Amino acid sequence: MTTPTIDEMRQNRLAYHFSGDCLRDGRPLPAIGEMLMHDGPIVWCEAGLYWSRKPHQALLYAPGPMLSLVRVGGTIIEPDYEDKGASTERTVLARIDATHLLRRFAADQALSVAHLWDMPEVVREYLTALDESKRDAARDAVRAAAWAARDAADAAARDATEAAARAVRDAAWADFDARVHAVLPAREHFQ
C-alpha cells in the first residue's frame, strides 16, 4: 500500500487524529462512521475539531494512543505554515490503538543509532523484543549511561576550563615578567 500524498489527502478530505480513551472535553470517542460537529466559529488553537494530514504531525498533539483516520468537512481552515488543520465536522472512518505501533517505531529508531554508543545488552534486548519484563532494567541502564556521559562531559569541560585558566594566568604572568625586565637592569649586573 502506498502512502497517500498531501494533495490526495486534501482532495479526499482525509486526515488523522489522535485521542486518549475519550475526547479532550471528556465526551466518549465517537463510533466509526459518527460525525462530530463543532457549533460556532473556529478559533485557532481554541475552538474547532483539529486534525493533521500526516500521522506524525498528529502525534505532536496526541493526548493518547488512539489514532483515527478521519474525513473532515464543513468549514475547513488549514494554513500552509501549520502542521494541523481545524474544521467544523470530523467523521471517524477507522481507528486503531497505536500503542504497540508507536513503541515499535520508537524502538526501531533507537536501534538505528545503536552503533553511535555503547548500548547495554539489556537495552538492546528490550528494544528488539519489547519484552516488558526487561523494561525497568533497560530504563535503569539507559539512565546510568546517560549520567555517566553527563559526568564525563562535565569532567571534560571542567578540565578544559581549568587548562584555559592556567594558560591565561601563565600568559598574564609572563607578560608581567617581561614588563618588569624591560624597566629593570639585567640580572647579570647584580651578580
Where are the regions that the model predicts?
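Short, glycine-biased loop/turn motifs at secondary-structure junctions and
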Residues: 1-191
